Amino acid sequence: MARSVVVALLVLLSLSGLEAIQHAPKIQVYSRHPAENGKPNFLNCYVSGFHPSDIEVDLLKNGKKIEKVEHSDLSFSKDWSFYLLYYTEFTPNEKDEYACRVSHVTFPTPKTVKWDRTM
């Protein structure tokens, strides 16, 4: 019985140590298809490699939050870091600017990454 108590304590200690590890998210913003003005497309924001899992992701049009956004389920990699995909349908043009804003404990303020239509 003493052995099982020791094993249980070691497991709890190792799990509590996971919460202390923090990794900043990598943010990638891209369209599903090459951008063509006036042609419907999908804007994607792929956020990966972050820990802990608490995160807030917003897609922006001209600095304002886009309301109709969908996302994948929160998933994790082999290294226990997390990843998510946020996406929305949009129609690019010359005047509108699109971006992805991410809030995470590893950032002192939210980080915004602009969509580069040439990518």
UniProtKB/Swiss-Prot annotation:
Coiled coil: none annotated. It comes from the Eukaryota. Gene3D superfamilies: Immunoglobulins. Keywords: Disulfide bond, Immunity, Immunoglobulin domain, MHC I, Secreted, Signal. Disulfide bonds join 45-100. Residues 25-114 form the Ig-like C1-type domain. One of its GO terms (biological process) is immune response. This is Beta-2-microglobulin. It comes from Lagothrix lagotricha (Brown woolly monkey). The gene is B2M.
